[in-house]
Amino acid sequence: MTDTNKMIINLAVFGRTQSGKSSAGNVLLGSADFYSSFAPGSVTKECSLGRSCHLHGFMRRGGQEISLQIQVLDTPGYPHSKLSTRCVKQEVKKALLHHFGQEGLHLALLVQRADVPFFGQEASNAVQLMQELLGDSCKNYMAVLFTHAEELEEAGLSEEEYLREASDTLLTLLDSVQHRYIFLSGRGNLCNEQRIKILERIMEFIKENHFQVLSLA
């Protein structure tokens, strides 16, 4: 297979402490690259890059089958229970430039627990961090990934019903990112079927941007 038949997709996950960033990254990769555990404080203290195996024939482009590889940058939660604001910003900025400085970023995922209300300053902190590090145009390359989506099913809510009850803060954010969002269930985290559906959704977002990347240089 030639290089023209291969595509590398660069993703980064951001969000509050215990939002499920590392677990979501593992689902995207299809492997347990990132350490994830329940804890009363922040678990991830430094950025880490994970790479998936090649997904052969995942999509077609120009009449040819394309082999896809996913790269995910896991970032510390923000605000962080152990690291200062300055340390988190420096760590994430350094990692973004190191890993994606030449190739650019296809999509930045704001990870938000579906069972935690999104409003107030704490909810806005991660969004502000993303804008500060990625620039004013970052919302053109941003999507919201809701974790713990199994809570919707237990509450008898569809995704549409959930969003109708969402806070104005969340609805405004979704409007600003052209309603790019994904729901991720915690049941069977590494389930390949769920992973493929999420990757297909992500590729839809990337196609909407005509495969352009957010420049970090």
Swiss-Prot record:
Record-linked InterPro entries: G_AIG1, GIMA/IAN/Toc, P-loop_NTPase
One of the record's GO molecular function terms: GTP binding
Annotated binding of GTP, by residue: G15, R16, T17, Q18, S19, G20, K21, S22, S23, S36, H148, A149, E150
Keyword Cytoplasm carried by entry: no
A Pfam family per the record: AIG1
UniProt keyword annotations, A-Z: GTP-binding, Nucleotide-binding
Family, similarity comment: Belongs to the TRAFAC class TrmE-Era-EngA-EngB-Septin-like GTPase superfamily. AIG1/Toc34/Toc159-like paraseptin GTPase family. IAN subfamily.
Protein name, per record: GTPase IMAP family member GIMD1
Biological source species: Mus musculus (Mouse)
